[in-house]
Design a protein with these regions (language model features):
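Mobile, glycine-rich extracellular loop/lid and propeptide segments
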Residues: 102
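Exported/periplasmic ABC-transporter solute-binding proteins
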Residues: 27-94, 105-122, 131-320
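Bacterial N-terminal signal peptides
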Residues: 10-20
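Bacterial N-terminal signal peptides that target proteins for export
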Residues: 1-11
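Serine-hydrolase catalytic machinery in alpha/beta-hydrolase-like enzymes
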Residues: 126-128
Length: 320
């Protein structure tokens, strides 16, 4: 079990030493600015684990940064922090030592909490707009159940039970609900649909991990036979494993066997961002505004998909 712990300032300071690895994994440039000839303007991101993925080949944010930088050669975007949403928020609240400019969370509640309870830490992302704009929605995700046994049909077993079955699987991996919105969604499914007794942190059937990527890794490593993960982790060019394979999508609302009766699995996983107060040059503020506009361009057919819509579809997200 992983207990939910707030990081100390010392731990956050230690994270500065490894922050360059986040940027390297995201495949982006350094900490440029608009000062000096030939230097590029840069902004720093903190990104929730599900949207960070596993760069460079399976990462929604890396794809988006590459598209944005290709269209804007004077700009760079660097991921300096990634992890569970609550962990990233804690880093920002406790000094923002990684100098984050934009926080992309896996929920709407955390950016809203920063806006209401830590207003001195946030900034409008479009200063010319009246009234000022602070938070914005950029994606909606989906929860999925994943097995580490190829060929396992999670849609229905021989007894007719579909999806997760506490009588069949010794343990199930989830992200820590106190830290990760996808963990909250998994908790809602396990308690509300499968009648597991709370608190899940002390339930021997449940293994909690510090973020959704760690839960996915636990299933792949066969630490747990199944786990609730983000759909984006198992999505390939807009398609996810279908019935008869080792994964099953859990949408927030599903049809049931009873006509006109819906199953409410969890609250929709709408993901929001918020600009963080930092010492930025006018050029960096302009870049920040441009990047938010890029992330919120949901243009789709009949006109060609925007880069944002192309990326959302590729990783099985939808527009919020």
């Amino acid at each position: 079990m992983f207990a939910a712990k707030q990081l100390t300032l010392g731990a956050i300071a230690g994270a500065i030493f490894i922050s360059s690895s986040f940027a390297a994994r995201a495949g982006n440039g350094g900490y440029g600015g608009d000062e000096g000839y030939g230097k590029k303007t840069n902004i720093n991101l903190a990104v929730a684990s599900n949207f960070y993925g596993v760069p460079p080949s399976n990462s929604a944010i890396t794809d988006l940064i590459n598209s944005f930088e290709a269209a804007n050669p004077k700009y760079t975007v660097t991921v300096v922090d990634n992890g569970a949403t609550a962990t990233l928020a804690s880093h920002i609240i406790n000094g923002n030592l990684l100098k984050v400019d934009l926080f992309l969370a896996a929920d709407t509640a955390t950016p809203q909490d920063l806006l209401i309870n830590h207003f001195n830490l946030v900034a409008p992302y479009n200063s010319s707009h009246t009234p000022p704009l602070y938070t914005f929605n950029y994606a909606q995700g989906v929860l999925a159940l994943l097995s580490n046994t190829p060929g396992v049909d999670l849609s229905c077993d021989t007894s007719g039970t579909c999806g997760y079955d506490p009588k069949v699987y010794s343990t199930v991996a989830i992200a820590d609900p106190s830290l990760a919105p996808y963990g909250v969604a998994a908790q809602s499914v396990l308690i509300g649909r499968y009648d597991l007794m709370p608190p899940l942190s002390s339930n021997p059937l449940v293994h909690e991990y510090p973020n959704i990527t760690a839960a996915y890794d636990a299933v792949i490593a066969k630490t747990d036979p199944v786990g609730f993960v983000t759909m984006s982790a198992i999505c390939s060019n807009g398609s996810y494993p279908t019935s008869g394979t080792s994964a099953l999508a859990y949408f927030s609302i599903e049809s049931s066997s009873i006509p006109s009766v819906l199953i409410n699995n969890y609250n929709p996983l709408t993901q929001a961002g918020i600009a963080i107060r930092n010492r930025r040059t006018p050029a960096q503020n302009t870049e920040l505004d441009a990047f938010v506009a890029f992330l919120t361009d949901f243009t789709s057919p009949p006109t060609p998909d925007s880069p944002m819509m192309t990326t959302l579809k590729k990783y099985c997200y939808s527009a919020p």
